[in-house]
Amino acid sequence: MKKNPIYLWVLLVLSALISSMSLFGILSPLPSKDALRASLANSGALTAQQLEDTVNYTYKVSESSHSIFNMLLIILSAILVVVAFVFLVRKNVQFANYTYVGYVLLAIVGLVYSYMNVQDAVQLIKDSALGLGMGALAKGTNILFIIINVLFLALVFYKMWRQQKDLTEEVEAEEAA
């Protein structure tokens, strides 16, 4: 390809930032319930039951983010981002696109896994209003991120289609000449 795929550079930089934050998240230690309770107790806006529910919810979500499956997803996604960068630097846009598509599909799998874990954590909340709010927030966040990933996927597929179409037109023009 003659053109520099700026769309892919932008998507990969955003993905690299997300992957690095996820890597730092799994490298940080799992907080204890006492530490969570102490940090939330200073807010003063929660009742004793809400405080305990929030501690249990936060601990369960943190625990699931440190699971082996989640760690494998994060490490694999970081590797895919690095590989896509390498392909892009070497001007192999097609393989960079394929690698990025793999990354996005893996990210969607990670979002579904995260959503299922958050729904399990919401079951620990006894306060119905708090549980409803946290469940709705988790659902909304996951839906938003899945939509963003699908849009990224659509953009990459569109660009791949355009690149193939341009390449076909170039070959036809050369054959006609």
What residue spans do the PLM features occupy?
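Cytosolic juxtamembrane helix and N-cap/initiation of the first transmembrane helix
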Residues: M1-A38, L155-D166, A177
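Membrane-water interface of alpha-helical transmembrane segments
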Residues: M1-L12, K60-M71, R90-Y100, L132-N142
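Cytosolic juxtamembrane helix at the C-terminal end of the final transmembrane segment
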Residues: K2-N4, V86-A96, A121-I125, N149-A177
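Hydrophobic residues within alpha-helical transmembrane segments
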Residues: V13, L72-I75, V101-L105, I147
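Interfacial non-cytosolic loop connecting adjacent transmembrane helices
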Residues: K33-S67, S114-I143
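Hydrophobic alpha-helical transmembrane segments
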Residues: F69-F85
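Hydrophobic alpha-helical transmembrane segments of integral membrane proteins
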Residues: K91-D127
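Small-residue-rich transmembrane alpha-helices that serve as helix-helix interface/gating elements
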Residues: N142-V150
